[in-house]
């Protein structure tokens, strides 16, 4: 799930995440087992690449960037111009879901073109006052339907929403809300 402060930020003003609670109740192994494809924005990917922590065995990783070069990052696939059609095609493949792992700008772009099916948010019991918002401006309106929730002992509130879709932008595959057991992929915002 994407960690957010109660006031709607996914990171502090300088990208800091020291306020995020690593709750032992959350089953991270089970969480990662739901995905066979990761989708990241450049700003989320770059610190991972510097730490040599970009990608997981058996999981395809795609990075949306207009500036990164494929030759510099052989363990991931860089998606430049036309990335939207590639993501749309990935969603039509059989397999597990796609994990949209940051950031806010990529989330906003995918939401705007109808390529996000589920939003899973972990609201941390903290107000940070400023930072990188979950949905950066210019934000769009998106109707959501609550599908599950959980309150953890740490005070984290986990919320899962299905996105009520409008028709996608011209040239992209229609998006359907899919169950996890569906053979086709679902794009899920989780972090």
Map each language-model feature to its residues.
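Enzymes that bind and transform nitrogen-containing heteroaromatic metabolites
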Residues: 1-191
